[in-house]
């Protein structure tokens, strides 16, 4: 396996350094790390310790593959942030967290928080929804349920899939990940190549 950047060929090292510069976001505290509530907030360690070339390539197969992977979600979120359009993925993440709520008493306050942040007229991070979906979601706020954001989340997912996801696949964020993850194969022929994310993302504290 590819252990860090030191063992890579010179050409790969240049690519790695360039990628490390472009993906400096991974060295900082990432909201996507906080998405996994099973880890202590005091000492969060990045889940994506290793990303194989095969996994990175799968991100190009579908948006679902991309955002269901910890590193993929982090890269996509950073790409959207660089375009000042991260509200869509933030809304999607909030909806995913909302659907995991077990206590009925916590649904209403969380639903209102999401609504005020992403959907209301005065939302600080308003997402682009059609009037019908926005009105439907507003009505759902009268008696919030676990599915009250499902339609809005589906619309935003489709929007990202048709727009920002396609741009992401052509961006340096993604292309650098593909190039670096393939470098391992130059050193070990026949072995499953992988990128050691720990060399780029030591921790998310």
Curated annotation (Swiss-Prot):
Palmitoylated on Cys-2 and/or Cys-12. One of its GO terms (biological process) is negative regulation of signal transduction. A lipid is attached at residues 2, 12, 95 (S-palmitoyl cysteine). The gene is RGS4. Inhibits signal transduction by increasing the GTPase activity of G protein alpha subunits thereby driving them into their inactive GDP-bound form. Activity on G(z)-alpha is inhibited by phosphorylation of the G-protein. Activity on G(z)-alpha and G(i)-alpha-1 is inhibited by palmitoylation of the G-protein. The keyword Protein biosynthesis does not apply. CDD domains: RGS_RGS4. SUPFAM superfamilies: Regulator of G-protein signaling, RGS. Residues 62-178 form the RGS domain. This is Regulator of G-protein signaling 4. It holds the Pfam family RGS. Keywords: Lipoprotein, Palmitate, Phosphoprotein, Signal transduction inhibitor.
């Amino acid at each position: 396996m590819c252990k860090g950047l030191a063992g890579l060929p010179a050409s790969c090292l240049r690519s790695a350094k360039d990628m490390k510069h472009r993906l400096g976001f991974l060295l900082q505290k990432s909201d996507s790390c906080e998405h996994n509530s099973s880890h202590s907030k005091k000492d969060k360690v990045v889940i994506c310790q290793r990303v194989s070339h095969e996994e990175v390539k799968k991100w190009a197969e579908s948006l679902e593959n991309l955002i269901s992977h910890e590193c993929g979600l982090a890269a996509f979120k950073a790409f959207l942030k660089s375009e000042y359009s991260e509200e869509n993925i933030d809304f999607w993440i909030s909806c995913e967290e909302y659907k995991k709520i077990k206590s009925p008493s916590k649904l209403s306050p969380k639903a209102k928080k999401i609504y005020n942040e992403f959907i209301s007229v005065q939302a600080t991070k308003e997402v682009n929804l059609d009037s019908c979906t926005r009105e439907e979601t507003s009505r759902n706020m009268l008696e919030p349920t676990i599915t009250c954001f499902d339609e809005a989340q589906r619309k935003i997912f489709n929007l990202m899939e048709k727009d920002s996801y396609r741009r992401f696949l052509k961006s340096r964020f993604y292309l650098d990940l593909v190039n670096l993850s393939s470098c391992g194969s130059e050193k070990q022929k026949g072995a499953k190549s992988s990128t050691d994310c720990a060399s780029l993302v030591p921790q998310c504290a």
